[in-house]
UniProtKB/Swiss-Prot annotation:
It is a single-pass type I membrane protein. The lineage of its organism: Eukaryota, Metazoa, Chordata, Craniata, Vertebrata. SUPFAM superfamilies: Immunoglobulin. Disulfide bonds join C51-C121, C118-C136, C160-C214. The keyword Transmembrane applies. Residues 31-232 are extracellular. GO terms for biological process: negative regulation of cell population proliferation; negative regulation of macrophage activation; negative regulation of neuroinflammatory response; regulation of immune response. Residues 31-141 form the Ig-like V-type domain. Changing N74A: Abolishes binding to CD200R. This is OX-2 membrane glycoprotein. Residues 260-278 are cytoplasmic.
């Protein structure tokens, strides 16, 4: 006599509870989000950082901190109870310019090198839950570029220098053979870097009338600075030296002739005076 076998799906309540619990936690975590945006501003200008909390729970207090190597440093807090509270080290430097518990903004009135870095905004909600976001501030200084050239007896120097923050890079376009290139960098106390590149042309006559291009790479952009080498400048230097030498020679000859003539006149007058006395 055969036996009947009944199969039914296995269902364990603890397993389903665990799955649903994990899903609920993931869903609640996904609903809490802090939206931030990094900023890049010019040095010694006004800069603002903003945080937005995306949750239905009402925050109790918003705290801004600066990230440091050892531990974050408290800067300012805002709450409905106490309003804006700025730490002594940041007074007259920053303020909360957007007063809100879901949206908060801090503003640096005159950015300095110390203000560059990353900042955390912490939202304390009911139940002592803390949610944070990070926004970074980067400061820059636009490039100041100088391009010029100098002729020497046996070579030509073409110099291109750029000062900026962060450090720029220099390259050349339109150069030929027989040219040496040297580049050096100098760091300044104001956070900028000067990069100087010098082209040394062994035969200057080959570059007269041509155009050289100094290319400055800065923050992903390349800017061309053009310089045309004066066509007549190289030949005018020897000519000018010859003219100056000739003029000096003529002046010396004129002085010598005048001196001799004046001396002869004095001798003649002296002889006539002696004859009259006799």
């Amino acid at each position: 006599m055969g036996s009947l076998v009944f199969r039914r799906p296995f269902c364990h309540l603890s397993t389903y509870s665990l799955i649903w619990g994990m899903a609920a936690v993931a869903l609640s975590t996904a609903q809490v989000e802090v939206v931030t945006q990094d900023e890049r501003k010019a040095l010694h200008t006004t800069a603002s950082l903003r945080c937005s909390l995306k949750t239905s729970q009402e925050p109790l207090i918003v705290t801004w901190q600066k990230k440091k190597a050892v531990s974050p440093e408290n800067m300012v807090t805002y709450s409905k109870t106490h309003g804006v509270v700025i730490q002594p080290a940041y007074k007259d430097r920053i303020n909360v310019t957007e007063l809100g518990l879901w949206n908060s903004s801090i503003t640096f009135w005159n950015t300095t090198l110390e203000d560059e870095g990353c900042y955390m905004c912490l939202f304390n909600t009911f139940g002592s839950q803390k949610v944070s976001g990070t926004a970074c501030l980067t400061l820059y200084v636009q490039p100041i570029v100088h391009l010029h050239y100098n002729y020497f007896e046996d070579h030509l120097n073409i110099t291109c220098s750029a000062t900026a923050r962060p450090a720029p890079a220099i390259s050349w376009k339109g150069t030929g053979t027989g040219i040496e290139n040297s580049t050096e960098s100098h760091f300044h106390s104001n956070g900028t870097t000067s990069v100087t590149s010098i082209l040394r042309v062994k035969d200057p006559k080959t570059q007269v009338g041509k155009e050289v291009i100094c290319q400055v790479l800065y923050l992903g952009n390349v800017i061309d600075y053009k310089q045309s080498l004066d066509k007549g400048f190289w030949f005018s230097v020897p000519l000018l030296l010859s003219i100056v030498s000739l003029v000096i020679l003529l002046v010396l000859i004129s002085i010598l002739l005048y001196w001799k003539r004046h001396r002869n006149q004095e001798r003649g007058e002296s002889s006539q005076g002696m004859q009259r006395m006799k």
